[in-house]
């Protein structure tokens, strides 16, 4: 229906509190039937105060297993949990993907790249205080970087308080 648009399916870590056990089976069946390009956005989010870490980990691992079985890459949402995510990726072995809104260290970046992942950079790197992440991005191989908007969220510095849109990508790329 929308030429050039493709789908990825997953249970975002901020929504696992609303998920049910049968959602994993529904996800498995939907992926087999619809053949999306990836599983995601999935991951771990240790930033929000009200969360169930055990439940997040369960849904993350189950979705990694689905991705591994379907031989699909994953789209990762990771906040304050990079090492835990890397541990599960090494343990389960998925076909790479994208670490969305990457904000880790040089060592963590190298580990993601070794596991077949691209690192996503977007609006967050345009803020003056984001010098560490800009410096890191500048050291990475160009083919390991994905520019992203996360529209309508995570606007660049010049759009604070406004809806983020894909037309901001060229200027975000200039910042990089």
State where each predicted segment sits.
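Mid-to-C-terminal alpha-helical segments outside catalytic/metal-binding sites
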Residues: 66, 169-176
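Divalent metal-binding pocket/active-site signature
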Residues: 13-115, 135, 140, 154-167
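Structural detector of well-ordered beta-strand residues that form the stable sheet scaffold
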Residues: 6-8, 39, 75, 98-100, ...
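Short, acidic/turn-prone active-site loops that include or flank metal/cofactor-
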Residues: 11-13, 103, 123-127, 151-152
């Amino acid at each position: 229906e929308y030429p050039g648009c493709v789908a990825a399916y997953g249970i975002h870590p901020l929504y696992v509190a609303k998920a049910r056990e049968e959602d994993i089976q529904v996800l498995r069946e939907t992926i087999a039937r619809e053949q999306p390009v990836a599983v995601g956005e999935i991951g771990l989010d240790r930033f929000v105060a009200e969360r169930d870490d055990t439940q997040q980990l369960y849904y993350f691992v189950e979705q990694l297993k689905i991705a591994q079985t379907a031989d699909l890459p994953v789209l990762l949402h990771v906040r304050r949990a990079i090492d835990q995510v890397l541990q599960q990726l090494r343990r389960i072995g998925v076909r790479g993907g994208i670490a969305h809104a990457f904000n880790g260290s040089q060592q963590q970046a190298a580990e993601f790249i070794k596991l077949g992942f691209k690192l996503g950079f977007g609006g967050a790197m345009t803020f003056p205080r984001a010098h560490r992440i800009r410096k890191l991005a500048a050291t990475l191989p160009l083919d390991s970087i994905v520019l992203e908007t996360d529209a309508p969220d995570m606007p660049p510095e010049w759009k604070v308080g406004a809806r983020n849109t894909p037309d901001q990508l060229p200027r975000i790329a200039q910042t990089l």
